[in-house]
Amino acid sequence: MSEHDMQNTNPPLPPMPPEITQLLSGLDAAQWAWLSGYAWAKAGNGASAGLPALQTALPTAEPFSVTVLSASQTGNAKSVADKAADSLEAAGIQVSRAELKDYKAKNIAGERRLLLVTSTQGEGEPPEEAVVLHKLLNGKKAPKLDKLQFAVLGLGDSSYPNFCRAGKDFDKRFEELGAKRLLERVDADLDFAAAADGWTDNIAALLKEEAAKNRATPAPQTTPPAGLQTAPDGRYCKADPFPAALLANQKITARQSDKDVRHIEIDLSGSDLHYLPGDALGVWFDNDPALVREILDLLGIDQATEIQAGGKTLPVASALLSHFELTQNTPAFVKGYAPFADDDELDRIAADNAVLQGFVQSTPIADVLHRFPAKLTAEQFAGLLRPLAPRLYSISSSQAEVGDEVHLTVGAVRFEHEGRARAGGASGFLADRLEEDGTVRVFVERNDGFRLPEDSRKPIVMIGSGTGVAPFRAFVQQRAAENAEGKNWLFFGNPHFARDFLYQTEWQQFAKDGFLHRYDFAWSRDQEEKIYVQDKIREQAEGLWQWLQEGAHIYVCGDAAKMAKDVEAALLDVIIGAGHLDEEGAEEYLDMLREEKRYQRDVY
């Protein structure tokens, strides 16, 4: 090609008018980004304007986007992440929003900006949907994350020793793998709204500024999807619960049992509340009036003394009854109360975190007052307490079977401390204080991480102990109502066959009707050698492996600290023994089941 061939034969562009130059000098980064895109679009259609059509695209800047992930056990982390995503989009930032149950863990290596909102379960473990990512980040194949910027919001309960542990672990591990922190981690307690809003506002402001520096094109402002604007299951929700009526409260353990388990039936007529097997019911409750009187007497406070609670001025007795947490002690309460008590022993307890955690777990608030008397005003005492929070119970019914009812399987918490009888807040309310036709405020808490297979022909294996059998009653009711072809296998454990066989006649009827195809029961105290569900799982290794090869889905419900861990260890033994895999292969197989949503757990 000659020099002449390389010369531009297009006419020279005219000089830019000075007023245009002046206008352009005043544009900010976002306006420049918009204008460049606009000019590019016009250039692409520029033949009519006498401009040459460009044959090759100019390189464009990588779009400024943020991935917002949530790992939720009860739905709180999901709702906070949804709100954060909406806030970022309103600020003109492009957002990719996902729940970790729908997110491929290996994609983390390609992320550039990541926000994670996570709760904590059990003894500091990540929520079920975050397990695969947590294992990847802490395993041999952990990716380098040196191109990632991140921020973490942890949700937890400070009455437990490993407060917000999952959030802390993710935050630390991201940094260890080379990622750069956008914002310091925030750990939010049960009353998380203010902390979560502050974190969201700060991260939105920071990213908006970062987007401007990068001259990124802002995403168009959008309104939240309809599902985020209103409660998905009718207008009633956590903030506006439905005043339901108690239909039945039946003890379903024998008189001789050490356990007091109640079958609770609640009327949802007129609520338009809908739920699916696997969902939970949120229950708001009032504290025991006797406990309120005991506390006020110990403090020497008149019940009629008025304080602020719930945005109102109320007698302190009413406020403690309905607005403050009295049955779950916290480190914050003990640390705040200690200066009023002026007791060296309590000061030593409050100063040692390990001792403090043990003390909080074993000593109810009222018994702190008994042991370490103090005088403080009603306002001062209320200022040490957390707001009352609802309790969540796995729903033990299917609406396909019970219609406008919802059933719960509630273990009443009862114990003695220093000779004084104590009871759980919500379980005591449901079992002892709520009368038939009495009102209980409820809402549905979705649990999309604990769902029956979409294909009802798939077999399911249900593993539960104690009240962990609750969702499986709902599962089998649903399968029976649909006349589902899929086989159902139940593993259930409790101390005694004669005293603790929850829903015995119903399981027998399901088996007779062809909807419970296999069942294995473990009665831990009916013989000298204790037998648990994990032992039954190992006994049935070949059968379980065969069901897995047929596409079975496995569900586990129960105690996270002990039972769920022991069951997972047993499942790994099954995969190693019957599946002929080594330990690493078994772990990978179980992770594959998790990612395929064929291994789901509802643990607490």
UniProtKB/Swiss-Prot annotation:
<dbReference type="InterPro" id="IPR017927">
    <property type="entry name" value="FAD-bd_FR_type"/>
</dbReference>
<dbReference type="GO" id="GO:0000103">
    <property type="term" value="P:sulfate assimilation"/>
</dbReference>
<dbReference type="InterPro" id="IPR039261">
    <property type="entry name" value="FNR_nucleotide-bd"/>
</dbReference>
<dbReference type="Pfam" id="PF00667">
    <property type="entry name" value="FAD_binding_1"/>
</dbReference>
<dbReference type="InterPro" id="IPR003097">
    <property type="entry name" value="CysJ-like_FAD-binding"/>
</dbReference>
<keyword id="KW-0560">Oxidoreductase</keyword>
<feature type="binding site">
    <location>
        <position position="566"/>
    </location>
    <ligand>
        <name>NADP(+)</name>
    </ligand>
</feature>
<feature type="binding site">
    <location>
        <begin position="524"/>
        <end position="525"/>
    </location>
    <ligand>
        <name>NADP(+)</name>
    </ligand>
</feature>
<dbReference type="Pfam" id="PF00258">
    <property type="entry name" value="Flavodoxin_1"/>
</dbReference>
<feature type="binding site">
    <location>
        <begin position="424"/>
        <end position="427"/>
    </location>
    <ligand>
        <name>FAD</name>
    </ligand>
</feature>
<dbReference type="GO" id="GO:0010181">
    <property type="term" value="F:FMN binding"/>
</dbReference>
<keyword id="KW-0521">NADP</keyword>
<feature type="binding site">
    <location>
        <begin position="409"/>
        <end position="411"/>
    </location>
    <ligand>
        <name>FAD</name>
    </ligand>
</feature>
<dbReference type="GO" id="GO:0070814">
    <property type="term" value="P:hydrogen sulfide biosynthetic process"/>
</dbReference>
<keyword id="KW-0813">Transport</keyword>
<comment type="similarity">
    <text>Belongs to the NADPH-dependent sulphite reductase flavoprotein subunit CysJ family.</text>
</comment>
<feature type="domain" description="FAD-binding FR-type">
    <location>
        <begin position="239"/>
        <end position="453"/>
    </location>
</feature>
<keyword id="KW-0028">Amino-acid biosynthesis</keyword>
<dbReference type="InterPro" id="IPR001433">
    <property type="entry name" value="OxRdtase_FAD/NAD-bd"/>
</dbReference>
<dbReference type="InterPro" id="IPR001094">
    <property type="entry name" value="Flavdoxin-like"/>
</dbReference>
<comment type="subunit">
    <text>Alpha(8)-beta(8). The alpha component is a flavoprotein, the beta component is a hemoprotein.</text>
</comment>
<dbReference type="GO" id="GO:0004783">
    <property type="term" value="F:sulfite reductase (NADPH) activity"/>
</dbReference>
<keyword id="KW-0288">FMN</keyword>
<dbReference type="InterPro" id="IPR008254">
    <property type="entry name" value="Flavodoxin/NO_synth"/>
</dbReference>
<feature type="binding site">
    <location>
        <begin position="155"/>
        <end position="164"/>
    </location>
    <ligand>
        <name>FMN</name>
    </ligand>
</feature>
<dbReference type="InterPro" id="IPR029039">
    <property type="entry name" value="Flavoprotein-like_sf"/>
</dbReference>
<comment type="pathway">
    <text>Sulfur metabolism; hydrogen sulfide biosynthesis; hydrogen sulfide from sulfite (NADPH route): step 1/1.</text>
</comment>
<protein>
    <recommendedName>
        <fullName>Sulfite reductase [NADPH] flavoprotein alpha-component</fullName>
        <ecNumber>1.8.1.2</ecNumber>
    </recommendedName>
</protein>
<feature type="binding site">
    <location>
        <begin position="72"/>
        <end position="77"/>
    </location>
    <ligand>
        <name>FMN</name>
    </ligand>
</feature>
<keyword id="KW-0198">Cysteine biosynthesis</keyword>
<feature type="binding site">
    <location>
        <begin position="119"/>
        <end position="122"/>
    </location>
    <ligand>
        <name>FMN</name>
    </ligand>
</feature>
<keyword id="KW-0285">Flavoprotein</keyword>
<feature type="binding site">
    <location>
        <position position="604"/>
    </location>
    <ligand>
        <name>FAD</name>
    </ligand>
</feature>
<keyword id="KW-0249">Electron transport</keyword>
<comment type="similarity">
    <text>In the N-terminal section; belongs to the flavodoxin family.</text>
</comment>
<dbReference type="GO" id="GO:0050660">
    <property type="term" value="F:flavin adenine dinucleotide binding"/>
</dbReference>
<dbReference type="GO" id="GO:0005829">
    <property type="term" value="C:cytosol"/>
</dbReference>
<feature type="binding site">
    <location>
        <position position="361"/>
    </location>
    <ligand>
        <name>FAD</name>
    </ligand>
</feature>
<dbReference type="InterPro" id="IPR023173">
    <property type="entry name" value="NADPH_Cyt_P450_Rdtase_alpha"/>
</dbReference>
<comment type="function">
    <text>Component of the sulfite reductase complex that catalyzes the 6-electron reduction of sulfite to sulfide. This is one of several activities required for the biosynthesis of L-cysteine from sulfate. The flavoprotein component catalyzes the electron flow from NADPH -&gt; FAD -&gt; FMN to the hemoprotein component.</text>
</comment>
<feature type="binding site">
    <location>
        <position position="327"/>
    </location>
    <ligand>
        <name>FAD</name>
    </ligand>
</feature>
<feature type="domain" description="Flavodoxin-like">
    <location>
        <begin position="66"/>
        <end position="204"/>
    </location>
</feature>
